[in-house]
UniProtKB/Swiss-Prot annotation:
Function: RNA-binding protein that recognizes the K-turn motif present in ribosomal RNA, but also in box C/D and box C'/D' sRNAs.
Transmembrane feature ranges: none
Official protein name in the record: RNA-binding protein YlxQ
Listed InterPro entries: Ribosomal_eL30-like_sf, Ribosomal_eL8/eL30/eS12/Gad45
UniProt-listed Pfam families: Ribosomal_L7Ae
Protein family membership: Belongs to the eukaryotic ribosomal protein eL8 family.
GO MF entries: RNA binding
Keywords: RNA-binding
């Protein structure tokens, strides 16, 4: 992913947070993956291996795209809360974010 698209994705995620279309935190995100509400999931690239494995396994099982693109500091900056895991629950935001990530 190029730097321009990375910044656009970060801005879009911040907008989704302000629009109330994000679920944050490991347990809530995993619950939304299970309930098939989460459309795309992000886990901090500096999260613990256990956290990464748990989120990725759940995402894989329920066929929810999961990305490890941002650090915890970047996630905190984007959403305004110190979190390592979050998911987008809106189809529109999820689709556009995935397009930006995949170039």
């Amino acid at each position: 992913m190029n730097e321009g698209n990375r910044q656009k994705a970060m801005n879009l995620i911040g907008l989704a947070m302000r629009a109330g279309k994000l679920i944050t935190g490991e347990e809530l995100t995993i619950a939304d993956i299970r309930n098939e509400k989460a459309k795309i999931v992000f886990v901090a690239n500096d999260a613990s291996e256990n956290t990464k494995k748990k989120v990725k396994d759940k995402s894989s099982y329920y066929e929810v795209p999961c990305f490890e693109l941002f650090s915890e500091a970047e996630i905190t900056q984007m959403i305004g809360k110190p979190r390592k895991v979050f998911g987008i629950v809106d189809n529109g935001f999820a689709k556009k974010t995935k397009e930006l990530i995949e170039g």
